Amino acid sequence: MKRVTTYLLAIIFVLISIHSKSQQLNAPDYSDYILTPAPPLSPRINGPSIYGVRPDSPFLYRIPCTGERPINFYVEGLPAGMSSDEKKGFITGSTDAKGIHKVIITAKNKHGKDTFEFKIMVGDKLALTPPMGWNSWYIHYDRISDATMREAADQMIATGMAEYGYQYVNIDDCWMRKLDSKDPGIGGKRRDENNVIIPNGRFPDMNAMTEYIHSKGLKAGLYISPGPSTCAGYEGSWGNEALDARTFASWEFDFLKYDWCSYRKKAKDKSREEYIKPYKIMWGELNKLDRDIVLNLCQYGMDNVWEWGAEVGNCWRTTGDLGLERGGDLPGFYHIGFSNAEHWQLAQPGGWNDPDYILIGWVGNAHEMAEGTPTALTPHEQYSYMSMWCLMAAPLIFSGDMAKLDNFTLNVLCNHEVIAVDQDPLGQQARIVRKNDRDFVLVKDMSDGSKAVGIFSLVNQAVKLSVKWKELSLKGDQQIRDLWRQKDIGTYDKIYSTEIPAHGVSMIRIWPDN
């Protein structure tokens, strides 16, 4: 009897353990917290209103558009050398016609149509609005593969993220061969007889992979370090910068994250010249190419990179890794965001302060390079996170599991009115106009003369917060729209007050009442 009892207790313990593990691995259902309205069945064209390309560079742009498919796309005013695909909604080609080309895009389906003015700026600048897309690091780490990248591209289309402007599908570290590894899949000869870098066994054909990503109208990104090795110990670009740049272009990549890592062993000193040097070299090599590659500087904010980053790149990390930020009473993204917000005057079209990726949905513990688990952030903290990044004109690069995107996470990532704040062509980053232990307020001037404002709660309970017009340099009656709910909430004079949940946000847009 005792043996049977022990056996039954063991079974119960195992079942409890399995149930507990199952509970831990199931994302909480936050559907009751969804704020973003579903898009209409009729077409709605989203995304930036301006896009940069260099003369004669290949151009690929997938028109972001929600609405029931099929949708037909009609594009007028394209420069010579460019054309559009009516069924796919892709704009492709190349042109040597420098200047700003005003293009009218019309999208039609059985429910209606939408028209959108889109400017193609042919010149020297790329990334005229902050890049949007996905990066593999915080979910796949050293497990990344060709198959995972293709799946991410598939999911960017299937989930609708592409219809809101997400376009880059970026590999982070660990695609090369690893130094001193005995694993035949990732170790071995790191460069061929011509010194061309060799991907590891998980990436059998880079050209086939980028072709697959491009076939969906999306763009492909890559990662490497200017040092001898990457942060995870894989082959770096040291001494092969020009060759690597040409190789990445021949593989048809569109984005490069260039991570300081082991370059610290090569820098002569801590002078500004030495901090700039590796990025200046790669920037120069990329600019020689006949392909546009956006350059993301990753060197953790050293030597006030925000003061010189625009000279040698398109966006630059202003802090250490967000995934390694421990946080405290407030989640880590607040601390990273506060630091990034200080540099608002130095953001501009073509050059953006980068506070790191959006870590919601399923993400892996960066300290352990672990498998993904549901984010510990509350729903209101996730709204605050996305609001802060959009107000700061940050690159919107999601780095969670693309295969486990639930409706709540998509509602945070895919609100076109919130994203429009990030993608505003004026390119101004929000500034902090108030910050104390209870709350802080960000305000961003928009190209149409309105202001986007975020009122953030820093306390652990719901609280009524206000913002006065004098804090925002406003006078008189002002119309206010709730951006998350996409709803006009009235006309206010001198002050706006609202109840905000713990660690939550009220993100609004304000226009004069005339």
Task: List PLM regions with ranges.
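Solvent-exposed, low-complexity, repeat-rich "mucin-like" stalks and linkers
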Residues: 25-28, 43-70
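Strand-loop-strand motifs at the edges of beta-sheets in extracellular beta-sandwich domains
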Residues: 81-97
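Carbohydrate-binding surface patches
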Residues: 383, 389-392, 397-399, 434-474, ...
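Glycan-recognition surfaces
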Residues: 243, 292-401
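Aromatic-lined carbohydrate-binding/catalytic grooves of carbohydrate-active enzymes
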Residues: 138, 152, 156-268
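C-terminal beta-strand-rich structural cap/linker in extracellular carbohydrate-active enzymes
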Residues: 491-514
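A short beta-strand micro-motif common to beta-rich folds, especially ectodomain repeats
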Residues: 63, 99-111
